[in-house]
Amino acid sequence: MLLTRKGPAGPRAPGRFAASLEGSLARALPTMDRRTFLKRSGIGAGVGLAASQLSLMRKAQAKDPAAATAASAGKQVVRRTVCSHCSVGCAVDAVVENGIWIRQEPVFDSPLNLGAHCAKGAALREHGHGEYRLKYPMKLVNGKYQRISWDQALQEISAKMLDLKKKDGPDSVFFVGSSKHNNEQSALLRKFVSFFGTNNCDHQARICHSTTVAGVANTWGYGAMTNSYNDMQNSKAAMYIGSNAAEAHPVSMLHMLHAKENGCKMIVVDPRFTRTAAKADQYIRIRSGSDIPFLYGMLWHIFKNGWEDKEYIAARVYGMDKVREEVAKWTPDKVEEACGVPEAQVFQAAETMARNRPSTVVWCMGQTQHTIGNAIVRASCILQLALGNVGKSGGGTNIFRGHDNVQGATDVGPNPDSLPAYYGLATGAWKHWCAVWGVDYEWVKSQFASQAMMEKSGTTVSRWIDAVLERNDLIDQDSNVKAVFFWGHAPNSQTRGLEMKKAMDKLDMLVVIDPYPSATAAMAAMKVEGQEVNPNRAVYLLPAATQFETSGSVTASNRSVQWREKVIEPLFESRTDHMIMYQLAEKLGFGKQLVAKLKLVPGKGNMMEPEPESMLREINRGSWTIGYTGQSPERLKAHMRNMHMFDVKTLRCKGGKDAETGYDLTGDFFGLPWP
């Protein structure tokens, strides 16, 4: 049910930041020396200043001003989409009139967000009509961005790619994909990179939850959230360690608060007292990075008091005897020395988790973004195995991921060490996916520098700087990286800012593809002491459509897959990411191979692009390892139309058929989560 405003909306005052860009900041550039760059904290100020060179939109308007006056009398269309601000997967109904996204409502029947918005999700519409959209392709010329045509951009970029491939090999190009791409675009980008002849590709997961994926996979098979946000309502105890869900994943707290109403005991372990900690029954302040001593301290009390699930361990866990030996070394005094946590608090946490089963453990960036993040994650998993909580409703490890499709991009997207669905890079994996893609294995192999490089992991987003700056004998490929694509990713959240700037300046080509002019574009434009370090470098900005200007599927943190409907047409000269991939592949000479088993449909301006539905079916045909095989676009759309049929605790369909397709959804779990 839509809560519809009957009267017209009032005028909106321009934001202060927008006004400042149009005023004083717009006069501050075009150049900035190194000293000023450092004084203004490098990246943050640089973004705002360099943004004055870029194409920014002011306010969304109807194409026909006269039509805008009569817009309220026009037909309103409701499009169902999914919020892009975190991994909960909140469904949103977008109301479109006269081609403009005029209003939004949370989907009250959604079993994931239960009809709720958070402050971030409530501003979702701004992605369609925000002030800072990149309007048209641009190229950096003499320190300033100048407008160019799409034809010029694609021609020059593809020519440079082919030149670099001929002179330095395909591994001289590195592609950073995006956890904002939908599943279809993520899989297509991995295919695109493979057909160019390299494994040099990555995305945001590398610097957020790659430690989770590896740590959890090495503990019990696959690296993903074991249960669901909803299932936490069945937990009798929950320990948040390294997660501030109240601010990072606000809607997820609804499920925790429902659990607390049912008597769930909530523990928060964090160096900071957060908004999540404010809701806890027990708050424990540990020293940053001391997660493992704390978790082993809990296990020490669990083993000492015989609280471990002995039958579960005997039947289902291997190696717990080795864990006991290590845990025995972590006596309460050593734990307190390492963590700063008194024994009584550690004992209380252990007792709460042991006496209130099933109990769950929740973590996020606080555990993963450490040099030993993989080991921290495994320690959390071991705790749950000792308590016998894994594989049980209300238990497990509920791992809150960040972006709306970081799980899906990890599952099927541009990973440097695997093909879609974690197939690895061995010959058999390549032959499997070549058959799925409808291309000859020998042809794909011929695109690589060698079979050895074809089966070797590529450069990661956390080390691309080294791939550019280090001596060639210190990197594991024939050539240094000479060109980088930032395709929906801005690296300004990473460390080593000055080295990053040096790496950008050393590149032969830098391509930024994004709906917004990001910090990457701003850093690339900054001169060093008033001089252009590499005047021969080519820098391009290409306007991509947002995820609300295309359709496709996204995978929430609990692995439920949801289908987004296209809300509005791509604004200005922006194009969908999969259209850009296809058009670039055409220029590079493998356009036919890229879409060999895909259906082409008219997109913006009647230009052809791969159909998202056919891309998902290709994923279904190939992803047997993780069971991404039954999530057909038709069935996902049926789930989105019939959210009211799914239980808000179990996510299982209580019974009913989809009126449009006749599918019997009885027994389906919402979004058909794998495995």
What are these regions (language model features)?
Residues 85-88, 92, 120, 602-607, ...:
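Residue-level detector of bioactive/disordered segments in secreted/extracellular proteins
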Residues 210-382, 386-392, 400-621, 625:
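Non-catalytic alpha/beta scaffold blocks inside enzyme catalytic domains
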Residues 20-23, 27, 55, 362, ...:
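Intrinsically disordered, low-complexity serine/threonine-rich segments
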Residues 2-307, 319, 329, 334, ...:
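N-terminal export/assembly segments and adjacent metallocofactor-ligating motifs
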